[in-house]
């Protein structure tokens, strides 16, 4: 199944506070597989170079524990329990064993822009025997560039967004408004897909990029039926996160 042949991707799995299901957890991943929707997860490296499924740099928000994930060994990370529910942090390999190719998987590689040692070969090693539909993506173009140089067989994409001044000092207002620096990098890297922020999904420079490269467009994070409509208008596949029954019904209807 190609990455664009799905109604949507559950952002960090199907998680909800109502049932004590935490983002990026094994339960959230299982629920998405059972619902038949694609899954978007976050991955970063342990200190011993094992890809772990977790979003934040530090453990505290989701576990109540102190510590930075990239400074910990995988075995220690896997023993950490989330603050709610019964799940522990899992590895990418655990996630692949849960999904088993039943639905497409988008793997966002977190670099946190910290200049940590390269992680790309570890990702390639874990994914080399996985036959299920999946793609690797990152905000950090240097990660995608290194994956390409290492010959990663996985589809590779960029995560892009609006360019607020505080995050993009030193660029012109035109560059900030258009997002052209990101899109130029996407062209240079010849990416296989792009995931762009829903609030900027109708950016004409983005439309031109998609038209020229003829690649799938995903949009994050869709949290309402109005946002879903905006994504649909641009033929963007939603990366969604919601307890909105109406939105889930719309996604089911489109499948």
Regions found by a protein language model. Give the residues of each.
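Phosphate-group recognition and catalysis centered on beta-loop-alpha active-site segments
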Residues: 1-255
């Amino acid at each position: 199944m190609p990455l664009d042949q799905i109604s949507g991707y559950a952002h960090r799995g199907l998680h909800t506070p109502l049932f004590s299901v935490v983002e990026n957890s094994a339960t959230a991943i299982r629920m998405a597989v059972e619902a038949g929707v694609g899954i978007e997860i976050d991955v970063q490296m342990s200190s011993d170079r094992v890809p772990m499924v977790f979003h934040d740099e530090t453990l505290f928000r989701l576990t109540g524990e102190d510590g930075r994930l990239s400074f910990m060994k995988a075995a220690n990370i896997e023993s950490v329990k989330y603050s709610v529910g019964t799940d522990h942090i899992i590895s990418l390999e655990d996630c692949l064993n849960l999904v088993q190719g039943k639905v497409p998987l988008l793997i966002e590689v977190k670099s946190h822009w910290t200049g940590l040692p390269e992680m790309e070969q570890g990702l390639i090693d874990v994914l080399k025997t996985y036959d299920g539909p999946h793609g690797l993506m990152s905000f950090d173009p240097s990660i995608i560039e290194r994956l390409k140089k290492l010959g990663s067989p996985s589809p590779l994409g960029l995560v892009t967004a609006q360019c607020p001044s505080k995050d993009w000092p030193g660029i012109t207002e035109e560059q900030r408004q258009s997002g052209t620096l990101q899109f130029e990098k996407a062209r240079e890297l010849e990416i296989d897909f792009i995931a762009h922020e829903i609030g900027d999904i109708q950016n004409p420079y983005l439309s031109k990029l998609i038209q020229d490269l003829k690649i799938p467009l995903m949009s994050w994070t869709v949290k309402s039926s109005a946002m879903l409509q905006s994504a649909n208008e641009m033929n963007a596949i939603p990366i969604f996160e919601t307890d909105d029954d109406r939105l889930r019904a719309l996604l089911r209807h489109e499948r």
